Amino acid sequence: MMIFILVPAVAPSIGAVIIHFVGWRGVFGAFVVLALVGSSWLHLRRPETLPPQSRRTLGLRSLAGAAREVMGDRQVQLVTLVMALGFGQMFALLSSAQQLFVETYHKGAEFPLWFAGMALLSGSGTVLNARYVLRLGMRRIVIMAYWMQVVVSGVMMVLVFGDLLPEALRFPAFFFWAVSVFFMAGVTFGNLNAMALQRKGHVAGMAASVVGAVSTLGAVLIAAPVGQLYDGTVRPILLA
């Protein structure tokens, strides 16, 4: 999950390096290379974890039954909703990040570096979660993380909407808030995913697919309108 959180933030830096050396067309070639490497690695190095007696047939009826079981579980439904809202917040920031860095805060030349720095700083969230999850429990950590995000975003909203920040502090305040969003993601998403799969070990593949697909789709439906509301300020993202 740490890799999952960090990759979207580090990706602009990787893309910038590819474009610098081989041009924008090289990005599409990179997709092909990465897909081949990933699929080859899984095929050659990743064994099947389920024992033979627990494996299901790859048939339509079996898949449909597993999907119904997953989607009918109330805990899975609630966790998926929370993940959609959390992903929506992160996707909304990602969709407007370049405009905010370039147009609002005039950091276009350093955008990949700032974004990579944001990813590295927020990665401490996954380390912190790994340290305390057994002591505090997944649910408690998730609740604490979201309350922290409410407080940080609330303070940021007061400062921005009240025009209380001097010019010199506007970008540092935004950067701190953006790091807090990714930090929250690092703390919560792994726990939420584990909570969704907690009682679905026998259909873990289908459960992971359903939770991931539904939460991502919900996040896109949240983030897309927010991105369209961009007005040259950070206000629409804060409201979201």
How should these model regions be labeled?
Residues 72-92, 179-183, 192:
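Pair of pore-lining "gating" transmembrane helices in MFS-fold secondary transporters
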